[in-house]
From Swiss-Prot:
The gene is trh-b. GO terms for molecular function: thyrotropin-releasing hormone activity. The modification Proline amide is found at P77, P91, P107, P121, P153, P168, P193. Belongs to the TRH family. It comes from Xenopus laevis (African clawed frog). This precursor contains seven copies of thyroliberin. This is Pro-thyrotropin-releasing hormone-B. InterPro entries: TRH.
Length: 224
């Protein structure tokens, strides 16, 4: 709109200049009065257009808060502009409030929670066991006793505290002795009663001494 008024003013000025050059000298006294009237009219029109545009802009700015307030009132109190805020945020920063809450927690528990989330679903129970062992020894003992009850009576896992109290160099020897003793029992049970070999001649001579041989002979006599 402003551009059109400026074009009109420019065209009027150009036409006035051309017309003044073509008029004779006798009409020079009357021509300036007419030109001044035209310029005054154009000036009034331009000023009026400026004022109207300024008033329209003020009215728009005045109506904009009212429209925003109406939209704000129509929305749910807990969901106002929530979607727009989430869209404007970075995808990796939308959980900023959760991150602030996690910072208030204990540093050691924060690491355990992250580990549980990253672990396989079937291995999270192991993480709980380790956390219970670190925080509470009584909980660890209860869990260990529960595991030992589920196992076979002859194959229960030995107590780790008992193993730690032993000498490091003697743990393997005692385990080997127990294994050889059990293997010899199994071999004796699988053989024929009348064909069982002498303990001193077998692969595992665990009781090859005179006292044990006499005791075995007495037991066989009583059995006969």
């Amino acid at each position: 709109m402003m551009f059109l008024w400026w074009l009109l003013l420019l065209g009027t000025a150009i036409s006035h200049k051309v017309h003044s050059q073509e008029q004779p000298l006798l009409e020079e006294d009357t021509a300036p009065a007419d030109n001044l009237d035209v310029l005054e009219k154009a000036k009034g029109i331009l000023i009026r257009s400026f004022l109207e545009g300024f008033q329209e802009g003020q009215q728009i700015n005045r109506d904009l808060p009212d429209a925003m307030e109406m939209i704000y009132k129509r929305q749910h109190p807990g969901k106002r502009f929530q979607e727009e805020i989430e869209k404007r945020q970075h995808p990796g920063k939308r959980d900023l409030e959760d991150l602030q809450l996690s910072k208030r927690q204990h540093p050691g528990r924060r690491y355990l929670e992250d580990m549980e989330k990253r672990q396989h679903p079937g291995k999270r129970e192991e993480g709980d066991w380790s956390r219970g062992y670190l925080t509470d020894d009584s909980g660890y003992l209860d869990l260990f006793s529960d595991v030992s009850k589920r196992q076979h009576p002859g194959k229960r896992v030995p107590d780790p505290f008992f193993i730690k109290r032993q000498h490091p160099g003697k743990r393997g020897i005692e385990e080997e002795d127990d294994t050889e003793f059990e293997n010899s029992k199994e071999v004796g049970k699988r053989q024929h009663p009348g064909k069982r070999y002498d303990p001193c001649e077998g692969p595992n001579a665990y009781n090859c001494n005179s006292g044990n041989l006499q005791l075995d002979s007495v037991e066989e006599g009583w059995a006969a």
